[in-house]
């Protein structure tokens, strides 16, 4: 069984920036420990990065609903938080060619670029922010692409846009056969 950790959008803007929260700040150390466990067990991990271009975001549907510019490509807010950034540098030592996955929507539509679609030997674990937006979207996309794979969301390593929405998203994921721990 291949165990794969997917760290969703742990970027400065979502942790300490304009969309940050105390809850997001509180999960950083737990995510770091989880990454270290994956490394010591020889498993792979990936980061998704919410990515928007300057001057375009506010014209998108997302920008209409959430008119707060964030994760603008090549800004400090776009970067992975400093406590986790070290895990994006020396990729060869982790046996990974590229572990930052850029996406300009809630979910990444091309998971099959990274993982063989017909393989049932994957166990995906998701952590990060926001539980009720990007975590749930990617969990459901993985469920769609890999219907027989085990998908886990570690609720103690996730934060939602509000605590209430975090809890609601976890319940929805449970009903879609995603293991919430």
Cite the ranges covered by each PLM segment.
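A generic structural signal for short
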Residues: 23, 69, 127-128, 157-158
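Conserved N-terminal glycine/acidic-rich loop preference
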Residues: 100-137, 159-181
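Active-site metal-binding loops of divalent metal-dependent hydrolases
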Residues: 10, 50-51, 129-131, 157
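Active-site acidic carboxylates
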Residues: 1-100, 150-152, 167-175
């Amino acid at each position: 069984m291949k165990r794969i950790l997917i760290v969703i959008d742990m970027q400065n803007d979502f942790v300490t920036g304009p969309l940050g929260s105390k809850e997001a700040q509180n999960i950083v150390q737990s995510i770091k420990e989880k990454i270290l466990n994956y490394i010591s067990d020889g498993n792979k991990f990936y980061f998704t990065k919410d990515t928007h271009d300057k001057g375009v975001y506010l014209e998108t549907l997302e920008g209409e609903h959430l008119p707060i510019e964030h994760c603008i490509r090549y800004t400090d807010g776009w970067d992975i938080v400093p406590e986790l950034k070290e895990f994006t540098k020396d990729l060869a030592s982790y046996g990974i060619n590229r572990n930052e996955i850029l996406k300009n929507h809630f979910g990444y539509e091309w998971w099959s670029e990274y993982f063989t679609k017909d393989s049932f030997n994957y166990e995906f674990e998701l952590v990060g922010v926001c539980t009720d937006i990007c975590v749930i979207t990617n969990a459901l996309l993985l469920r769609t692409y890999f219907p027989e794979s085990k998908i886990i969301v570690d609720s103690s390593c996730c934060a939602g846009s509000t605590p209430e929405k975090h809890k609601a998203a976890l319940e929805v994921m449970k009903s879609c056969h995603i293991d919430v721990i």
